Amino acid sequence: MTPPRPIPTLPVSAEAASDTAVPRLPTTVVSSWKGGVWKTCLSASIAERLAFAGIDVLYLVTDDQLDARRRLGISEADPDVARVQRGAGSVTVVGLAGPHAVDLLYRSGPGRFGRFDAIIVDTPPVKKGGCLPGVLLVTPTDGDDASANLIRMLRATPANTEIVLVRIDRVPKAEWAHDAGVIAEASNRTEGLVYLPDPLPRTAEVREALNRGRSVWTLPRRGMTLDFLRGGESLAGLAWTHARPGTTLPPLVPATPSGVHIHGWDDGA
């Protein structure tokens, strides 16, 4: 049997490849393919630090919005789109999921929520959290299981995304440097990947502040809390440079003295 004559196939221009897209505003994403690695703690801290530096930040939450809002001192009674002042700048929290978040980042922009200088994204612990192109991707890990998931996530990360590896929990710096090299090699990322050399400690003082909606940047700068803040400052500095190329993060206002620091006692606070 002779088949019927086929019609000609006409070309249709394709959308831009997702691995070359760039967000409408400078965007930092904090993501890990594992829960419990202080992901929301880091994203909220970075957003607040940028605001303290004088810019207006959109904090886009694609994970549990209530958790992120609570960490910024926003109650359930506050509006869905809530804004908090931090120094001369502000953080506006918006909860969007899936294609709605992508539409805001890459197509429509955040204009309906206000004017912003930068976007910080907090994602759920899923692989697609590392698949956003053209962003600064901060990826916390806290051990072998988390690192194995992280490697699988980074293998799917677009080439135009910059990656920052962060170690949560105290381990020797040399051990973390070795592990960071293993992660980079196993994820096939020879370029566009850096790491924070000092592991970030989990401190009760930081955890309690976030659970109460208090900014970590108002805590006494001592002991392990100071170590955490130094790491947060470095990450915020990268996010700032991503948003304001050629400039450096303005220094934080000096802390108010809070008395003597007792080594071994305050360190565990």
Question: What name fits each language-model region?
Answer:
Residues 1-34, 55:
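Extreme N-terminal, non-catalytic leader segments
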Residues 114-129:
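Glycine-rich phosphate-binding loop used to anchor ATP phosphates in small-molecule kinases
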Residues 215-269:
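NTP-binding/hydrolysis catalytic cores, primarily Walker-type P-loop NTPases
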